[in-house]
UniProtKB/Swiss-Prot annotation:
Lineage of the organism: Eukaryota, Metazoa, Chordata, Craniata, Vertebrata
Region Disordered, annotated ranges: 1-24, 75-94, 724-766
Entry GO MF terms: ATP binding; ATP hydrolysis activity; helicase activity; protein-containing complex binding; RNA binding; RNA helicase activity
Domain of life according to the entry: Eukaryota
Binding site for ATP: G185, D186, T187, G188, C189, G190, K191, S192
Modification Phosphoserine occurs at: S749, S750
Originating species: Homo sapiens
CDD domains named in the record: DEXHc_DHX34, SF2_C_RHA
One example of a Gene Ontology biological process annotation: nuclear-transcribed mRNA catabolic process
UniProt protein name: Probable ATP-dependent RNA helicase DHX34
Family affiliation: Belongs to the DEAD box helicase family. DEAH subfamily.
Encoding gene per record: DHX34
One GO cellular component term: membrane
């Protein structure tokens, strides 16, 4: 209840009464902040054309001050002639009649406070001043409209001057008569921006235009939206991974080829499109070639679908003949001549591949431009380099030259940069200053930069190729093709006569290949074959590619997918393969996600899988910075790179959740590119949604956290974030910024990274990535997941390493036997197909290699009779890696260390043993020698049971979810949480087992003479207790007995193999007391089938069995000590330790 109104309160109100109209006019001050705030509250609301605090609002006040000065000047002149005119009046413009109101030329209404019916906003505003302000606002809108129409007229003149403008009607007419049209145009003809607009003007409303790169989708959508007068994100939009401006009103959408293929995967007939434009088909990207094959099959079933193939004038007949001699509309390119200057560089025989690129030839070009062309002549320089390392080398030297001359702004351009840094190349240099853009081949066709007059062509390009024999990705530098050289030359001369400097001889150009090698002929085809299988396009070997890939590459990919379990023996998709095809990642990363969904490790696996699917977030410059290394050291994990990335992401999320901390500065201090972390967050969310869609993860419930006030605050924050995003998008394409003379480059950090927190209303200072992140993600959920992940127990960490190890298998590397005596930088590792690999410089083990061999110092405590390379230890390790990349050396990328023996027993696809199982060979190249044969047999038997149970549980889970999705009657029993918990405990117990063994890589000669070969075997052993229900049969090539599809028993050559299966010693069963001569295998088989041995009982006994499993080890066995006369249950290690006590 409100308090009673006292006389004192009334007197106070009278004292502070509102001023009268006359008093308000006398005290009125247009520059007063409170006055401006009241006017903004009245006129610049959320629903108005100009919003309070926006960039447009700031522009209005600048205009208003100029208008006021102009009107005051005219008023003072008129007062001399007409002294009776009011002082503070703002009259109409001199060249307009007083009765004219410019609002009739403006397609919107400007309402005042009284018209709005607002209470309180306008009560302190005099009506006369409100009318004056309203008139000034109308003048501003009229002025802005005149400016817009002036820009529009200029834009239309520029469009009409493009070479393709004369061919617009011809393209539309040809498309009307044919289903497929090839539009071939040289660089700069305008095909990418104009053809979609011609279709829009012709009445097509569902147009998709594919681009090979994301940056091209964004830049073209902005340009076409600006030229077509479409509001950004409405009629014209783009759709790329994690980001989309597409809406229900969108008529033209620019999207990546991979995204369109995903849409075809969901809806094979593509009913949502009338016209498909496939741009840059001449680049021959992998997915582009596949898309052309899909469209060739689709078009007969969709006669209403039109397809336009847009290409440079390169091998046009190939595309035309592929689509039944489709008509070609050829458009001329540039209008201005281009002078080609050949500047071959002298060969330097002493230069090695590891040395940096010499930047001096590029600096000489800059000097020649400065001397020959005056700064008043506009024209920027575009330099084509082969890769990021070459860009960094030239960037450093060019920035030094630019700081000395003050005539250049040097900018890098490559796909690893953030969008903000990529957009800088479209900004304008200051007067008298030129831009020098150092680019990879991304600027060859995908990005068009206005104002380029000079081009420097290094003649080199780096391309990724796949070596199926060594199973590695090889990034190599090649000479470009003649077609690429012409494309690069064409970037000059778009706006005037241009110059192309070629840093090679004309004879080199004549020796170039005519066209680049199609990507489908030089990369791994695993993901493509998997996608083809999921789209049911038939046998990949017979698919109608425009140019088929090498048959060996297809066979390698199919064999790899069969090994990974994605395809069965008949090359049909397995349940895990169907799910892997839905995940936009490599097969090994997809396997991690599926395996992690079985256990209670979904959150850490999601983060690690996302981190391994993007480029490394660590900047190149930070690798040589001691300060960055010291700041990043607490985040490094001695378990491997995936766990370091895991720690980095979790720590970044914690920083994000604290309002008082700046995540950009946090990342810069540690040498981390923040936009890579944004990509991880987006990818993590996508993975989570995919697992939820397939029933492998329970959907998150949208919980209402906090009281009503907290929820109101959250809604207000989201509303403010939406407003910031809208302001940024509205202001993004209006005008280009003027670059500074010294544009800092720090591995992709944008201008916002260098600034502190921006004021809420300043759109120029908005970290738009942060805004999008907070709108797209539930920060509280991410923070809770990060907090829980930081407290992973020892058991969870071991289980997580098992999941990673199985997902990455068979990508293993074994350390060289002499690594412990090498320097840190000289650590060598060997894979099955590649010897002499080294750790990537960004690998956490590259700086701490002692972690990899310090564990094996335990071996020095064992008997020294064996060779150093055959040391016995229970802590041998292998490196599991995500990729093997060869540049100047073969590098292991993103490594994690895993226990060698347990991992090989659980994951190897080929496991061969000798007679007593003390010698094992995994996958035909890694030999394990175990000290105790009985322990070896027990461990082998345990691994067989665990493998079978794990595989069965995974198949049942995937089959159960598939039946649920198809709403079929469930035939498979779902995996219970209790069963998963039991399996987890037994896997952990298995990995914790300790048994001395040696590990070494077999030589080629040893591999050739490894097997006993087929032979006459007198009798097949019957060992149901050891190998379960497996039927043993002689192996036709290796010899010995084939137990399972991966295990072959007693096939390895050994001096004692001929007699090992008949050597028996007396043994007493600890359960039933049986005393008989048995071989080691027969002993284990009897123990596993002994009627008096503990067996799996009813559910009530399961907990007791689990407790026993936790307290004892599968390697423990009865041991009678002769020295002390006592009986024990010891592992072999414990036996040795006990014996030493009596020495």
């Amino acid at each position: 209840m409100p308090p009673p109104r006292t006389r004192e309160g009334r007197d106070r109100r009278d004292h502070h009464r509102a001023p009268s109209e006359e008093e308000a006019l006398e005290k009125w001050d247009w520059n007063c902040p409170e006055t401006r705030r009241l006017l903004e509250d009245a006129f610049f609301r959320e629903e108005d054309y100009i919003r309070q605090g926006s960039e447009e609002c700031q522009k209005f006040w600048t205009f208003f001050e100029r208008l006021q000065r102009f009107q005051n000047l005219k008023t003072s002149r008129k007062e001399e002639k007409d002294p009776g005119q009011p002082k503070h009046s703002i009259p109409a413009l001199a060249d307009l009649p007083r009765t004219y109101d410019p609002r009739y030329r403006i397609n919107l209404s400007v309402l005042g406070p009284a018209t709005r019916g607002s209470q309180g906003l306008g009560r302190h505003l005099p009506a006369e001043r409100v009318a004056e302000f309203r008139r000034a606002l109308l003048h501003y809108l009229d002025f802005g409209q005149k400016q817009a129409f002036g820009r529009l007229a200029k834009l239309q003149r520029e469009r009409a001057a493009l070479p393709i403008a004369q061919y617009g009607n011809r393209i539309l007419q040809t498309l009307k008569e044919h289903q497929v049209v090839v539009v071939a145009g040289d660089t700069g003809c305008g095909k990418s921006t104009q053809v979609p607009q011609y279709l829009l003007a012709a009445g097509f409303s569902h147009v998709a235009c594919t681009q090979p790169r994301r940056i091209a989708c964004i830049s073209l959508a902005k340009r076409v939206g600006f030229e077509s007068l479409s509001q950004y994100g409405s009629q014209v939009g783009y759709q790329i991974r994690f980001e989309s401006t597409r809406s229900a009103a969108t008529k033209i959408v620019f999207l990546t080829v991979g995204l369109l293929l995903r849409q075809i995967q969901r809806e094979p007939s593509l009913p949502q499109y009338e016209v498909l434009i496939v741009d840059e088909v001449h680049e021959r990207h992998l997915h582009n070639d596949f898309l052309l094959g899909v469209l060739q099959r689709l078009l007969p079933t969709r006669p209403d679908l039109k397809v336009i193939l847009m290409s440079a004038t390169i091998n046009i007949s190939l595309f035309s003949s592929y689509f039944s001699n489709a008509p070609v509309v050829q458009v001329p390119g540039r209008l201005f001549p281009i002078t080609v200057v050949y500047q071959p560089q002298e060969a330097e025989p002493t230069t090695s591949k590891s040395e940096k690129l010499d930047p001096r030839p590029f600096l000489r070009v800059l000097e020649s431009i400065d001397h020959k062309y005056p700064p008043e002549e506009r024209g920027d320089l575009l330099v084509f380099l082969s890769g990021m390392a070459e860009i960094s080398a030239v960037l450093e030297a060019a920035q030094t030259y630019a700081s000395h001359t003050q005539r250049w702004v040097v900018l890098p351009l490559h796909s690893a940069l953030s969008v903000a840094d990529q957009d800088k190349v479209f900004d304008v240099a200051p007067p008298g200053v030129r831009k020098c853009i150092l680019s990879t081949n991304i600027a060859e066709t995908s990005v068009t930069i206005d104002g380029i007059r000079f081009v420097v062509d290094s003649g080199k390009v780096k391309e990724m190729s796949y070596d199926p024999q060594a199973k590695l990705q090889r990034l190599q530098e090649f000479w470009i093709s003649q077609a690429s050289a012409e494309q690069r030359k064409g970037r000059a001369g778009r706006t005037g006569p241009g110059v192309c400097f070629r840093l090679y001889a004309e004879s080199d150009y004549d020796a170039f290949a005519p066209y680049p090698v199609p990507e489908i002929r030089r990369v791994a085809l695993d993901s493509l074959v998997l996608q083809m299988k999921s789209m049911s396009v038939g046998d990949p070997r017979t698919f109608p590619f425009i140019e088929p890939p090498p048959p060996a590459s297809l066979e390698t990919a199919i064999l790899y997918l069969r090994d990974q379990g994605a395809l069965d023996s008949s090359e049909a998709l397995t349940p895990i393969g169907s799910l892997l095809a839905q995940l936009p990642v490599d097969v090994v990363i997809g396997k991690m996600l599926i395996l992690g969904s079985m256990f209670s490790l979904v959150e850490p696996v999601l983060t690690i899988a996302a981190a391994l699917s993007v480029q490394s977030p660590f900047t190149r410059s930070a690798q040589s910075s001691p300060e960055c290394a010291a700041a990043r050291r607490p985040l490094e994990s001695d378990q491997g790179d995936p766990f370091t990335l895991f720690n980095v992401f979790n720590a970044w999320v914690q920083v994000k959740s604290e309002r008082s901390r700046n995540s950009r500065k946090w990342c810069r201090r540690r040498g981390i590119e923040e936009h890579r972390l944004y990509e991880m967050a987006n990818l993590r969310r996508q993975f989570k949604e995919l697992l939820e869609d397939h029933g492998l993860l329970a959907g998150a419930q949208a919980a209402q956290v906090g009281d009503s006030y907290s929820r109101l605050q959250q809604r207000r924050e989201r509303r403010a974030l939406h407003q910031l995003k809208r302001q940024h998008e509205e202001g993004a394409g209006r005008r280009r910024k003027v670059l500074r003379l010294q544009e800092e480059q720090d591995g992709g950090s944008s201008d916002e990274d260098r600034a502190g927190p921006a004021p809420p209303g300043a759109s120029d200072g908005v970290d738009i990535q942060d805004v999008k992140f907070k709108l797209r993600h539930d920060l509280a959920q991410l923070q809770a997941a990060a907090s829980s992940a930081q407290d992973l127990s020892r058991e969870q960490l071991a289980l997580l390493k098992l999941v990673l190890g199985r997902g990455l298998y068979p990508q293993l590397a074994v350390p060289d036997a002499f690594n412990s005596s090498r320097k840190d930088s000289d650590q060598i590792f060997h894979t099955q197909a590649k010897q002499g690999a080294v750790l990537h410089p960004t690998c956490v083990f590259a700086g701490s290699p002692e972690v990899l061999h310090a564990q094996e110092l335990e071996a020095s405590n064992c008997d020294g009779s064996r060779d150093d390379k055959d040391k016995m230890s229970s802590k041998h390790q292998l490196l599991s890696f995500v990729s093997l990349l060869e540049t100047n050396k073969p590098y292991l990328v993103n490594c994690v260390r895993i226990p060698a023996l347990q991992s090989l027993l659980l994951f190897s696809r080929s496991l061969d043993t000798n007679g007593d199982c003390s010698r094992l060979v995994a996958d035909g190249w890694l030999e394990l020698q175990l000290a105790d044969s009985e322990s070896a047999i027990r461990l082998l038997a345990a691994s067989l049971r665990l493998r079978a149970r794990w595989e069965s549980a995974l198949d049942r889970q995937l089959a159960h979810q598939a039946q649920q999705q198809l709403e079929e009657e469930e035939e498979d029993t779902p995996v219970s949480p209790k069963e998963v918990a039991t399996l987890s405990k037994e896997l952990l117990q298995f990995t914790a087992s300790k048994i001395p063994y040696s590990l070494r890589r077999l030589t080629g000669l040893e591999v050739q003479n490894m097997y006993v070969g087929p032979q006459t075997i007198p009798a097949t052993p019957h060992l149901p207790g050891l190998f379960g229900s497996s039927t043993l049969s002689p192996h036709p090539t290796k010899g010995g007995y084939a137990v399972t599809d991966f295990l072959t028993y007693n096939c390895l050559t050994n001096d004692t193999d001929l007699y090992s299966d008949c050597l028996r010693t007396f043994w007493t069963c600890p359960h039933c007391g049986l005393h008989a001569p048995l071989t080691p295998l027969e002993r284990i088989a009897h123990e596993n089938t002994c009627p008096q041995a503990p067996q799996d009982g009813p559910p009530g006994a399961e907990e007791a069995a689990l407790e026993t499993l936790q307290k004892t080890s599968v390697l423990q066995r009865p041991y009678h000590c002769e020295a002390c006369g006592k009986d024990f249950l010891f592992t072999p290690t414990e036996v040795l330790r006990h014996r030493k006590q009596h020495v």
